[in-house]
Amino acid sequence: ESGQIKTTADLDKAIDRAARADLDRRWLVADVTTWYPVTEEPQRHFTNAVAAYARKDYKAAATEIRKATSYLRLEAGRATGAPKQDLDRSVAQLDMLAASMETGAVTDEHTLANAFANADHALAVAHRAKATESWARKDYDKAGYELKAAAFGLESAADWTGGEAKAGASATVAEARAVGEKLASGGAWTRDEVTKGLDALGHSIDELGRKIGRAT
């Protein structure tokens, strides 16, 4: 169908055109191989925003923030309940940040890091919830991809937070990523290790949420 978005590249072009009103309708998640690469896009745009801010290109920084926000909107469209509310809060925070950035009102990188940590944490919460749902449905490959995406969200949020948070999350991230890869690739796994990975990831996400003042 004309106008439908089927690839990450198509999606990025649509976001470049700021065509957000009907983005959810046109974004076709055909399978996880199309969907999964999208999960790392917000972090890429967050990193670009910090680089643009450092060189005082505030308009470019605002544009990068808005691109990242569009991806969060897509995830909010897939989410339900508390994870959706968490993503919606981050979308609102990022919208305000982009507006402030454009006027030159953002005075330090800490403001960016805080907002980006919140957003990545919200993504981790949402993906972990989806991983649990997929696991319960015995949709094991989907659970694996969601688990890996949740691990990436936690890692990214911890990176923005820095210090003990970054060090504390590293082991859990590695464990969840390894289990997720086994599930996604059809490798050998046990129910105990998957349950342990999901539980440990949930605990680490909650712990980081408390550190950054994010309700979970």
Annotated model-derived regions:
Residues 1-216:
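Long, charged/polar, soluble alpha-helical segments
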